[in-house]
Amino acid sequence: MNVIEGVVATPNARVAIAIARFNNFINDSLLDGAIDALKRIGQVSDDNITVVWVPGAYELPLVANVLAKTNRYDAVIALGTVIRGGTAHFEYVAGEASSGLSSVAMNSDIPVAFGVLTTESIEQAIERAGTKAGNKGAEAALTALEMINVIKAIKG
């Protein structure tokens, strides 16, 4: 039986982080967590990390697609926060961000890690950005690194 598993230590990985400015008081913590995980656990150097700011979560798939098509990155990490409000806007933005990022991953053959919080409240978002529920930015970074290695192992 063959078993393929990825590791997170990936010193030569080239990683792009696409991050939404909207709700940046939360997203800044996601970014800090992602960069810390890339550098401390993944051993990725500053020179191999590119951060691209976009207006909001809805814009993440387009930028992730452009980044993936450059062939300069081994993975893209998408970070953002969508908080439910009193209108259907939440469903549209969260749904399009999720399906768009998934589509980029499927069509580009590079990992696109989903670090977009979709929460019911600001409190839930804060918890997932580094307090009670860990840091989802760091988790997305580790997912990206592991997937880089899984795909490399599959391709041989």
UniProtKB/Swiss-Prot annotation:
Assigned keywords, A-Z: Riboflavin biosynthesis, Transferase
A cellular component term, taken from the record's GO annotations: cytoplasm
Short name of one Pfam family: DMRL_synthase
EC number(s) given by UniProt: 2.5.1.78
Binding positions for 5-amino-6-(D-ribitylamino)uracil per the UniProt entry: 22, 57-59, 81-83, 114
Gene Ontology molecular function: any one: 6,7-dimethyl-8-ribityllumazine synthase activity
Active site per the UniProt annotation: 89
Pathway(s) per entry: Cofactor biosynthesis; riboflavin biosynthesis; riboflavin from 2-hydroxy-3-oxobutyl phosphate and 5-amino-6-(D-ribitylamino)uracil: step 1/2
SUPFAM superfamilies: Lumazine synthase
Stretches that traverse the bilayer: none
UniProt superkingdom: Bacteria
Binding-site positions, (2S)-2-hydroxy-3-oxobutyl phosphate: 86-87, 128
Reactions catalysed according to its record: (2S)-2-hydroxy-3-oxobutyl phosphate + 5-amino-6-(D-ribitylamino)uracil = 6,7-dimethyl-8-(1-D-ribityl)lumazine + phosphate + 2 H2O + H(+)
Function, as annotated: Catalyzes the formation of 6,7-dimethyl-8-ribityllumazine by condensation of 5-amino-6-(D-ribitylamino)uracil with 3,4-dihydroxy-2-butanone 4-phosphate. This is the penultimate step in the biosynthesis of riboflavin.
Subunit: Forms an icosahedral capsid composed of 60 subunits, arranged as a dodecamer of pentamers.
Family label: Belongs to the DMRL synthase family.
The protein, known as: 6,7-dimethyl-8-ribityllumazine synthase
